[in-house]
């Protein structure tokens, strides 16, 4: 039986301290099983890990935060083309609800993406999430773009690390204002900022 979900769409400025605290706990529990390093950014009430989202879709059930997706509009470079996108990140579904939340969160976010007038939305996830993201892309809602790496700046400066990192991740593109055929070709996406 599917749990009753209540969805909240909110701009970052609308979140209260209690919202950030609850979201930080959600992310620690959701990302923690993938490694303690992945949960560390959410210590101290941080509800973001790299770049801070401007808009969030948060799903709640009787037990609190159940699912989350953040959005940040930015220009990226794909090959030689600069492109305005809505980056989707901070994707999460509480472990006991896996298979139920992400599809619903993109469906809640999709009309907002259309209102924002962006040509594309894109996200980057670990290859281990291929099956989950594949379900999200069924029916032509999105496309998994293979063979693309993403270069980002680190969210903090470390004297012992280079200022950028290039990752081999799974890139997912959602055509919003333009058809998928207009997504630029290229094997490298330059975020020109930290990941969301």
Curated annotation (Swiss-Prot):
Keyword Nucleus among UniProt keywords: no
Pfam families documented for this protein: NodA
InterPro entries on file: NodA (IPR003484), Nodulation_prot_NodA_CS (IPR020567)
Keywords: Acyltransferase, Cytoplasm, Nodulation, Plasmid, Transferase
The keyword Methyltransferase appears for this protein: no
GO MF, any single term: acyltransferase activity
Localization: Cytoplasm
Gene Ontology CC terms, in alphabetical order: cytosol
EC number assigned by the record: 2.3.1.-
Catalytic EC class: transferase
Domain of life: Bacteria
Entry similarity comment: Belongs to the NodA family.
Reported function: N-acyltransferase required for nodulation. Acts in the production of a small, heat-stable compound (Nod) that stimulates mitosis in various plant protoplasts.
Protein name (database record): Nodulation protein A
Gene: nodA
